């Protein structure tokens, strides 16, 4: 989610190396066998900023600096090369090699002409010029998601509502991310839409230009990451990823709702089967709504309209657990005294890590998404039970209420529970908290809401699939095509329904997986298990930052874990070659992560040093 900083200030890039050089140095991994070198390909802010502009004291802004460089056909290749040589002196070699990630915003390539919007060849020239000159491996990131929003064509695209996702009121989201405007571009794959035509044409043009590069340069391109973080959008994009109350989601545009009805028709075949399986009553699929109303606050024409964070039949039982002595061997969820299953733990809770000095790992989260869809109406009790040396202790308990569709009264009798549990607070060193659900949370299962969420996931998958097809048809090599995706579920306090990205994260996808990782996700047993369950083998990490500072060796351990797991590349976020006089003074969640030896925030200085150390391998 942090790729916007470099997008706002200029394209980014990483060093290049020939395929022969990469594979000549293949070495055994610690798990046995051999593998090609791991490419450490940091995001570099300011890739197009030339030394000559920096030397001109009268050049005061980044915009003026870039103009100065473009007018003289200069670029930042020298500055990029010097940065990477500091990280790995003497060029790329060994089992770990330093490169860089070059970001190209596709819609930003367009300029207005008397004939309409056309690609500016000079913008592509300057981008590829750096790639030609910097002799190190490079990951090229084709940015075409909601962060591709700074080009002059953006204003024209936003005037046509067909290009944008909409909230239920028919309006597109007005979003920002640390001062950077976000555009809620549609996930529709309709090639007639202007936004899709311009994105595909730009990708075709750049791919054609790449194929004219000398073979030695092309071979230094180790991966292409596609489109950026593709997912649905929601209000308060900076802070709202964990919203569960009064949620709003996309896409309720007329085209999206019409496609939802077609999706339902394909799934159920007939309206009679739909009515039978859902218990809802509609005369035709054309009458079926995209659910959008909260039954607690709004009048429904029919129950199928109900939508909230729990309407799809899942209730998260989630919180955090700090157990530094590894006293607890297992967490289990019991509902009404019956075992439901083991509670996944070790999920990312960077907020807890930041809030409490004595907690030295962000991987404290636990979460079980309880499917309550088949449970009877009434009050139920959930208990999170910890097993320690054969004894069971209650870590948390909470009551929730399943409400019938008619909102009729339910029995208030005390639900059954696991008796005679010890208190987990008595376990030495153990600290915990239950965040969700709130006590007596009321839930209303609407099967149409479950379908709506699945359909929204299919929209994200379909667009990424279409973008992947564009790349293949443009002639880019299939073995180098990676996604650039977020994994919301690794953060136990987030609401994955807001993103609806789950279907894109399967190992069966035609693209290779590129999974962004921040905080505890960078070295996460939960995420490794997730990848194993989803049969993800070949992968890369297009954005990577542990954001930790409390324990020595954290950053090295995280990078080594991905070497051992077979990652092709990881892209530390982020380095900057922008002169300080061009940077804003305000600190925010993104620029805290600038990797430099004098920036202790979020452990950025330690990560900087760890990259230098690891590149010696």
Residue spans for each PLM region:
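Bacterial N-terminal signal peptides
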Residues: 8-20
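Catalytic domains of carbohydrate-active enzymes, especially glycoside hydrolases
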Residues: 32-43, 56-110, 122-141, 470-474, ...
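Substrate-binding cleft of secreted/luminal carbohydrate-active enzymes
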Residues: 43-46, 136-149, 222, 228-229, ...
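The substrate-binding groove and active-site-proximal loops of carbohydrate-active enzymes
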Residues: 62-76, 103-120, 179-202, 445-461, ...
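Aromatic-lined substrate-binding rim segments of carbohydrate-active enzymes
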Residues: 74-179, 190-212, 463-474
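Polysaccharide-binding and catalytic clefts of secreted carbohydrate-active enzymes
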Residues: 160-330, 334-342, 346, 377-379, ...
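Aromatic sugar-binding surface patches on proteins
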Residues: 348-370
């Amino acid at each position: 989610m942090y790729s916007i900083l470099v997008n706002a200030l200029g394209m980014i890039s990483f060093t290049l190396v020939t395929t022969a050089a990469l594979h000549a140095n293949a070495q055994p991994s610690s798990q046995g066998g051999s593998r090609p070198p791991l490419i450490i390909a940091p995001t570099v802010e300011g890739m197009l900023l030339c030394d000559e502009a920096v030397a001109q004291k009268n050049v005061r802004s980044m915009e003026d600096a870039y103009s100065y460089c473009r007018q003289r056909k200069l670029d930042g290749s020298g500055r990029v090369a010097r940065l990477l040589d500091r990280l790995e002196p003497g060029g790329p070699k060994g089992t770990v090699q330093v490169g860089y990630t070059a970001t190209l915003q596709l819609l930003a390539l367009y300029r207005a002409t008397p004939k309409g919007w056309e690609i500016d060849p000079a913008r592509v020239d300057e981008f590829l010029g750096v790639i030609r000159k910097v002799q190190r491996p490079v990951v090229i990131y084709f940015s075409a998601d909601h962060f591709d929003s700074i080009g002059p064509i953006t204003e024209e695209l936003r005037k046509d509502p067909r290009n944008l996702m909409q909230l239920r009121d028919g309006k597109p989201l007005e979003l920002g991310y640390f001062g950077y405007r976000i555009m809620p571009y549609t996930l529709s794959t309709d090639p007639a839409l202007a936004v899709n035509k311009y994105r595909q044409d730009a990708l075709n043009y750049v791919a054609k230009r790449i194929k004219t590069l000398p073979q030695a340069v092309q071979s230094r391109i180790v991966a292409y990451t596609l489109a950026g973080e593709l997912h649905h959008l929601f209000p308060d994009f900076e802070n709202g990823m964990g919203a569960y109350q009064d949620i709003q989601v996309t896409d309720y545009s007329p085209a999206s709702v019409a496609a939802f009805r077609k999706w339902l028709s394909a799934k159920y075949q007939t309206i009679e089967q739909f009515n039978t399986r859902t218990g809802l009553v509609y005369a035709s699929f054309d009458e079926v709504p995209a659910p959008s109303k909260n039954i607690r606050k709004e009048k429904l024409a029919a129950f199928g309209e109900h939508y909230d964070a729990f309407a799809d039949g899942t209730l998260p039982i989630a919180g955090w657990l700090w157990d530094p002595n590894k006293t607890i061997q297992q967490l289990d969820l019991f509902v009404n005294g019956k075992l439901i299953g083991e509670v996944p733990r070790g999920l990312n809770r960077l907020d807890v890590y930041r809030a409490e000095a004595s907690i030295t790992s962000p991987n404290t989260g636990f979460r079980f998404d309880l499917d309550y869809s088949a449970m009877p109406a009434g009050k139920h009790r959930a208990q999170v039970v910890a097993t320690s040396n054969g004894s069971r202790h209650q870590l948390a308990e909470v009551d929730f209420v399943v409400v019938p569709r008619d909102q009729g009264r339910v029995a208030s009798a005390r639900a059954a529970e696991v008796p005679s549990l010890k208190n987990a607070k008595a376990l030495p060193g153990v600290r915990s908290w239950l965040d969700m659900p709130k006590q007596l949370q009321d839930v209303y299962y609407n099967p149409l809401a479950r379908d709506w969420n699945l359909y929204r996931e299919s929209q994200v998958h379909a667009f990424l699939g279409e973008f992947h097809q564009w790349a293949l048809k443009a002639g880019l090599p299939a073995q180098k095509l990676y996604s650039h995706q977020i994994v919301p579920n690794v953060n136990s306090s987030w609401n994955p329904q807001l993103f609806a990205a789950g279907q894109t994260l399967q190992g069966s996808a035609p693209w290779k997986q590129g999974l962004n990782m921040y905080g505890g996700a960078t070295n996460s047993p939960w995420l490794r298990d997730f990848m194993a369950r989803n049969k993800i083998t070949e992968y890369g990490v297009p954005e990577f930052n542990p954001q930790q500072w409390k324990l020595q060796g954290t950053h090295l351990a995280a990078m080594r874990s991905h070497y051992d797991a077979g990652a092709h590349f990881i892209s530390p976020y982020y380095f900057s070659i922008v002169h300080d006089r061009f940077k804003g003074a305000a600190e925010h969640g993104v620029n805290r992560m600038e990797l430099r030896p004098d920036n202790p925030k979020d452990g950025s200085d330690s990560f900087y040093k760890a990259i230098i150390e690891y590149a010696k391998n």
